[in-house]
Amino acid sequence: LTFEIIILIAIIIASAAYVWHKSSSAKTTPILLDKYDKLIISLLSIGYALFSFIHLGSFQQFKTTWHGEEAGNQLNIQLVSPSKIGHIYYYSGINNGKYHWSDLNNANQEELINDPTANLGYPAHFKWNKIDLPVSDALIQQINLTIDQAPLEIKQLAIFDTNNNYISNLKIKANNSAENLSGLISSSAPQDYENSFSSSTVFDEIFYATTAYQLLHGLDPYVAVHPPLGMILIALGIAIFGMSAFGWRIIPDICSILLVPLIYIFAKRLFKTRRAAIISTILIMSECMHYTLGRLAFLDGIVTLFIILEYYYLYSYLELRSNGAKFSACYRSLWLAGLAFGLGISCKWSALYSAIPIIVILLYGEIVLARPNLRQFLHSLVINLVFFVVLPISIYSLSYLPFIHSQPNENELFKFIWRMLQYMYEFQAYGLQNATHP
């Protein structure tokens, strides 16, 4: 494993060193940004950033966790004053297990409680869940949560009576832990306990935010059907801000913010006018999918940034070739395009769709614009294979290091990645036919 890692890192460093050495004196086309462009970029980027940060997510984290680690583990919630219970809310962390709730009334009769979350068909990771109890005159003195199949983490509880009054006078214990679990109950009703966008995972965040957390802590990742780089980047936000809604959303949001200046610079270079750059930037800023997906812990916003960056450097390459630049003058643009392509496919396979435009652009640049002889064409072919095949594969392979670190019996990176490729293909081709989804 160590040898494989050294080889991959050496490929990236050696290719970068070669490119910067060979193209250090090459003259590139200026982007034509003046002080007014820079001011406009700053205002648009800051404006979009401030708007995107509004209600991005709560910073709230829960310090106490009960771990249901094997079947039969039980969490007992005793009401000091027996009451008529109307609703039970619980915030679950890792939730791959099966479990059931029951209550014990003042006549010592135990009844099962129907929990819709336990029968969803997909795991309710890092979110608030709600149980509505049927109307009854019985006074409940104890609520039990029993593990049928591990694991399950409970991080917070909120119990309300039939008049919607919060009940805080509770005693909590577990049959598998002597730890003080009083932190599972707060003195007043928790914020955002209604499974809101502000506090809980939404849609595919259940998968991506959870996997990011697992990769950060060396746990077996829940999601293996996408390359891990996007989730590693999400984990960076979690490492800084904790496992909170803000923590798992901040990096995708930053990527959506970075797309604003990138679009402006690209449009200015493409159309050569400030008006076109402003219109292009306003269009992306007001685009609903960009705004919505950029504020969620999804992979789409991250991979979009890398794809646009890839096309920016490919256009830079075409511009150089159109102006009669030597092939060596294009090294930096091509290497950076290959780098962006590698980062994109390491986040999500959808970035592979750009491979066909890459081939078309390179063939156009090297055959139509450059009109090389056979030797020159073969030389450019080899360089482009390094930049757009070897370099991206190296980046893709290195992105699996946190994943393989979580697998104690795996010590061969390339074989592991090959098995992951097969698994991902099978899932994308056939595995979604009967899949349940949040």
How should each PLM-predicted stretch be described?
Residues 246, 250-271, 309-313:
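Transmembrane-helix motifs of polytopic, lipid-linked glycan transferases
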